Regions:
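Long amphipathic N-terminal alpha/beta scaffold segment
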Residues: 75-101
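Conserved catalytic cores of phosphodiester-cleaving nucleases, focusing on short active-site segments
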Residues: 92-94, 105-113
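Charged, structured surface patches that assemble and position nucleic-acid processing machinery
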Residues: 1-83, 112-209
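A broad, low-specificity signal for short, low-complexity segments enriched in glycine/proline
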Residues: 52-55, 101-107
Length: 209
């Protein structure tokens, strides 16, 4: 991953990145879990799981934080910041610093939804839609596997040569308590690896008004 995202960005692109709001994905996840445990329990299930149209942005922000936090802890082994951006072909950007040099990685976020939400969507449908992207030098695609992981074949993707993206990763939950998560990738490599990580714990820092 580090080798594929270490190219310097142009001054114009860097200025655009500097104007984004960068946040710590770990703190985003801690704040959300605190809200979930203390305020959301009595609400409708669609609201609790952020499955309404109005809450879609929140759900995607949480997924972006989950993926970025896992990558920071298990793959990059260095702190990562994340910023929302829906320009071009990506939903958010990860940023980290190694030896005083800034690295950026644009990420397109996809989801294989739960069977009770949309059982008709299969992973092959998502693979087919990925063919439209052209970011072989820097674009990373992350697919959230929101189904029972025991019944999902992590090695089901075969037509790697048809994609013009830099990397392809899966991530998802490993237990009902949502305390254990995994990353799997890059799927475009010959030997993808699985990385397991725990949902972060800590003190919330938001203020309700």
């Amino acid at each position: 991953m580090k080798e594929k995202t270490n190219k310097s960005v142009g001054n114009i692109q860097r200025r655009g990145f500097d104007q984004l709001t960068w946040v710590n994905p770990k703190q985003v996840l801690i704040n959300y879990r605190h809200l979930e445990l203390n305020f959301l329990d009595s609400l409708d299930q669609k609201v609790r799981t952020l499955r309404t149209n109005k809450l879609k942005e929140w759900r995607e922000a949480r997924d972006a934080a989950l993926f970025s936090y896992g990558m920071a802890n298990e793959v990059l082994k260095t702190p990562v910041l994340v910023a929302k951006s829906e320009k071009s072909d990506y939903d958010f950007i990860m940023k980290w610093i190694i030896e005083e040099k800034e690295f950026y990685c644009p990420v397109q976020l996809k989801e294989l939804p739960p069977d009770d939400i949309n059982p008709n969507i299969q992973i092959e449908n998502i693979f087919e839609k990925l063919k439209k992207y052209c970011g072989e030098h820097d674009l990373l695609v992350s697919i959230k596997i929101n189904r029972e992981i025991k019944s999902f074949d992590l090695n089901s993707f075969k037509n790697k040569e048809n994609l013009k993206i830099s990397e392809l990763w899966y991530f998802g939950c490993l237990n009902p308590e949502q305390s254990k998560w995994f990353l799997y990738g890059s799927i475009l490599e010959s030997n993808p690896s699985q990385y397991d990580f725990a949902y972060p714990k800590g003190k919330q820092n938001y203020v309700l008004q």
